Structures are given as structure tokens and as C-alpha cells.
């Protein structure tokens, strides 16, 4: 829902497509709009490629965040939240100016507790170089909470109304336990 995708059946096969009734603030619509604005190809495949690159990074970071918090027993080390990452520019900075650099080479000190990750995941992807960086996305994009959202308010009722898409993504990921090791 947040991504702006849905599952459809075509000739007995389940396929993923853009939402029939799109939320303008969804990640898909935000990417499509910006690709169009910059006169870059905005076909389904191009949009999905960018989305996969970015969501893979964010999911990896969610796993990393949960381990950092667990190892240090410091909830304040959570960094995928609107307080520390309030827009797509800051998220891009985290990708390329924090995670991709050794602590000594960083210009930003607010994330010193996050280790250097010697990983191609945090190098600018060819697709980003050719088309769009995550910082190009509209920070003011908003989306309605999904009617059956798992995200609850302080009264334990499902949240309603509009929310910034990036903040919704962080809230959604926070609703799951990424620190569990599972049963063997």
C-alpha cells in the first residue's frame, strides 16, 4: 500500500502492478512524478528498479538498527524515525555520507554509533546515476493510512488521516520486531 503497488491476477497468474486507485503520495507515484518532471523514463520497470534499490537499503538498515539497539541496550540509537531522518535528503545522506564512509571520513557526527558498512548496497547505483536519487523525491508527499493498518494510536485504535509517506514507512517498519532471532 505504501509502495503504491497491488497484486492482480492475469490469466491465473499473480502479478504486481501499480495500484488501480493510486495514492498520490505513495512511493510509486512519487517516483513516477519525479521521473516525469526530470524527463526520465518513468515506465513500470524503471520505477520498480528504483523502489527495490531503496527499499532494500531501508530494510537492511532496519535490521542493522535493531541489532545496534539490542547490542548497546540503548533505544535512543534508533535512527529510522522522523526525529532523526525527517526527509529523503537526510536518508540519502545516511546512505552515502554515513554508511559508505569510515567514521574518520564522515563530516556528520550525529550517527557515530552506526558502523561503516563496506557494502556495494551503499554505493550510488547506476540506475540512480541515470535517473533519480532518493533525495529528489517530494518530502511533502502524504498518504492516507491504510484502512486496515496495523499502526495504532495512543488509544490502541487504528490510525487514520494523512501522514508523510516516509514517516508512514518508518512507523510501519517499527510495528515489526526486526531484532528477534527466531526459533530453531
Please provide the spans of the model-predicted regions.
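Preference for the N-terminal adenyl/adenosyl cofactor-binding alpha/beta module
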Residues: 1-184
Amino acid at each position: 500500500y505504501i509502495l503504491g503497488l497491488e497484486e492482480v491476477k492475469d490469466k491465473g497468474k499473480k502479478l504486481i502492478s501499480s495500484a488501480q486507485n493510486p495514492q498520490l503520495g505513495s512511493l510509486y507515484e512519487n517516483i513516477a512524478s519525479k521521473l516525469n518532471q526530470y524527463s526520465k523514463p518513468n515506465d513500470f520497470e524503471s520505477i520498480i528498479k528504483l523502489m527495490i534499490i531503496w527499499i532494500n537499503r531501508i530494510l537492511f538498515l532496519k535490521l542493522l538498527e535493531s541489532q545496534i539497539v539490542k547490542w548497546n541496550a540503548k533505544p535512543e540509537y534508533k535512527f529510522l524515525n522522523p526525529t532523526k531522518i525527517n526527509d529523503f535528503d537526510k536518508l540519502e545522506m545516511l546512505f552515502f555520507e554515513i554508511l559508505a564512509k569510515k567514521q574518520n571520513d564522515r563530516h556528520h557526527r550525529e550517527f557515530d554509533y552506526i558502523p561503516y558498512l563496506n557494502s556495494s548496497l551503499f554505493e550510488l547505483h547506476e540506475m540512480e546515476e541515470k535517473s533519480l536519487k532518493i533525495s529528489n523525491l517530494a518530502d511533502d508527499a502524504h498518504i492516507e493510512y491504510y484502512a486496515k493498518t496495523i499502526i495504532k494510536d495512543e488509544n490502541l485504535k487504528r490510525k487514520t488521516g494523512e501522514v508523510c509517506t516516509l514517516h508512514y514507512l518508518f512507523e510501519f517498519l517499527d510495528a515489526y520486531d526486526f531484532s528477534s532471532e527466531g526459533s530453531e
